[in-house]
Amino acid sequence: MAATTAETRVFLEVRGQLQSALLILGEPKEGGMPMNISIMPSSLQMKTPEGCTEIQLPAEVRLVPSSCRGLQFVAGDGLHLRLQAHAELGTKLISMFNQSLQAQECCTFYCQSCGEVIINDRKLLRVLPLPSENWGALVGEWCCHPDPFANKPLHPQENDCFIGDSFFLVNLRTSLWQQRPELSPVEMCCVSSDNHCKLEPKANTKVICKRCKVMLGETVSSETTKFYMTEIIIQSSERSFPIIPRPRFVQSVIAQCLVQLSSARSTFRFMIQGQDDKVYILLWLLNSDSLVIESLRNSKYIKKFPLLEDTLKADSSSAWSAVKVLYQPCIKSRNEKLISSWESDISVHSLTLPSATCLELLLILSKSNANLPSSLRHMNSFQVAFLKI
């Protein structure tokens, strides 16, 4: 294969379950030099009159050069080809909810944005997932007696933690009324017109970090507080606070939520809405087995993949598992008809997050989309993006 370029952009997406890869070599620039491209199982090699550039693939990715097919040149994009690939999908997940919470363990709740301790050294005796929204209907269908819990909310007892789709429910009765220091970094801000901060919880009360003023959650009752997974890190009290870039954390939490919900409920369409009940994004999960190369190193320089940058330090051997999604922004009254259609569809699942986090997620999606090769940015009327797991 030959092309003319002084510097070629490389895009590589490997599908683990399909054992296939899409390789795109950026469109040559005018005035470039001839270049021969060689594909080997563990590397890509580009030869020009000036020398040879070799891009090493991560150890978990191996290409099958003889399977190359579908070779075509796409104007404005570059050289496209597909080939077989072997990839190991093992990836180090950011520990956030189910993975980090263990019963009988003392945990500390941190504000993810600034690292402030929100709840210190809380021993969780029970860590339980909340049932799905249709659990009451299932009880009525399968039980021969009336449901004793019909229309009653589930509230955690002291030292309980209930896990929802995108939030934790924690009982803070003791901490609130006995003025324990574990809640001292958190202030209760009432959303009423007088805007006074009161200790007495109300249904419309936000929980805000005193240090960075980020909304962490809201009070559900006088004893129960909801913390959003995108705002809180829960660690064993024996471990220190992990420093994770905010965009990296947000997309990992959302990606893992999408994967778990799609697996548990066979739903692939999601409405991302704020705590103000406004819909910000419509998401459609395409697949969760993509492996995307983030950084490519050669002898002269390091080419960084802009696709998923935000970034932890990446090296030539790193690859990240990612979910591939279609999305539609819904801010400024966009896509109102589509929102109405999705709201009436029982197969669509809603995820509620702080409004500021919804905008953060939209920015992450837009940045991912803008850095994709132009031919991959749209599918039908939706935009395409990757969220790093």
Swiss-Prot record:
Single Gene Ontology MF annotation: cyclin binding
Keyword terms, alphabetized: Acetylation, Cytoplasm, Metal-binding, Transferase, Ubl conjugation, Ubl conjugation pathway, Zinc
Region (Interaction with UBE2C): 235-257
Pathway note: Protein modification; protein ubiquitination
Annotated binding of Zn(2+), by residue: 144
Modification note: Ubiquitinated by UBCH10 (E2 ubiquitin-conjugating enzyme).
Localization per record: Cytoplasm
Domain notes: The C-terminal half (AA 188-389) is able to bind cyclin-B and shows a self-ubiquitination activity (mono-, poly, or multi-ubiquitination) in a HECT-like sequence dependent manner.
Protein name: E3 ubiquitin-protein ligase E3D
Organism: Pongo abelii
Recorded name of the encoding gene: UBE3D
